[in-house]
Regions:
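Positively charged n-region of N-terminal signal peptides that target proteins for export
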Residues: 1-5
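Bacterial N-terminal signal peptides
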Residues: 8-19
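Boundary at the C-terminal end of the N-terminal hydrophobic targeting segment
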Residues: 22-24
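Acidic/histidine-rich alpha-helical segments that form the ligand environment
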Residues: 40, 109-164
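Short, contiguous alpha-helical
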Residues: 62-111, 116, 151, 155-159, ...
């Protein structure tokens, strides 16, 4: 009887060890990481919508120069890029093999992404597939598309248990980024181009109404 009890206890102990080991290997966002990502997504959502609020058709389409984007074009770029980054995160980054050994390569990049990307003194050329082509007819349609894209991003961040820190994808300028950094890049990119919208609005030839 004691032998059976002993073996039963051993089996239970092994099961508990396996369960603990499994939990230890499962990593997801910490509460602080989730809160930080959502805070930045919400802040840049609000700032962008505020920057385009109340613009007339003339203001919406005004170009400071032939080779510079209008508010409409910048807004389209923000929206298209968000959808592209989120799609790549889902279809490429998170389907790549987990590589926790790469974590050291991206250590400290959280704050760098949020500081460097919005800095308009660093110039970069958007790839052709992310450039504006007039995908939406007006400000309302563009706004609706942006709202839908941002809602998808924020819903994912709010609810996901994906292992965002152990899956990586290369960025042509920023190097390897884990899944969480790609999320931060969405908000940092929005901030960068919201600043660009403010530059357009500050142009001396920007329509008064």
């Amino acid at each position: 009887m004691y032998r059976k009890l002993f073996f039963a206890l051993v089996v239970i102990a092994l099961c508990l060890l396996c369960a603990v080991s499994s939990l230890a290997q499962t990593t997801t966002l910490t509460p602080a990481e989730r809160e930080n990502a959502l805070k930045n997504l919400q802040a840049t959502h609000d700032a962008f919508l505020q920057s385009i609020s109340g613009l007339s058709e003339k203001q919406w389409k005004f170009k400071p120069a032939p080779d510079r984007w209008s508010v409409a074009e910048v807004s389209e770029h923000i929206t298209v890029t968000e959808s592209a980054i989120f799609g790549m995160l889902q279809k490429q980054v998170m389907t790549s093999p987990a590589a926790p050994e790469k974590r050291a390569e991206v250590a400290g990049k959280d704050e760098k992404i949020l500081q460097i990307v919005p800095d308009r003194s660093h110039k970069a050329q958007a790839p052709e597939f992310l450039q504006p082509t007039g995908r939406w007819a007006n400000r309302a349609d563009t706004t609706n598309a942006f709202e839908a894209a941002r809602r998808t991003t924020m819903d994912y961040v709010r609810t996901t248990n994906d292992d965002l820190r152990d899956h990586f994808g290369p960025h042509p300028l920023l190097g390897p980024l884990d899944g969480y950094l790609w999320i931060l890049l969405i908000s940092a990119h929005s901030e960068r181009h919201t600043k660009q919208i403010e530059e357009v609005k500050a142009d001396p030839n920007f329509p008064k109404d």
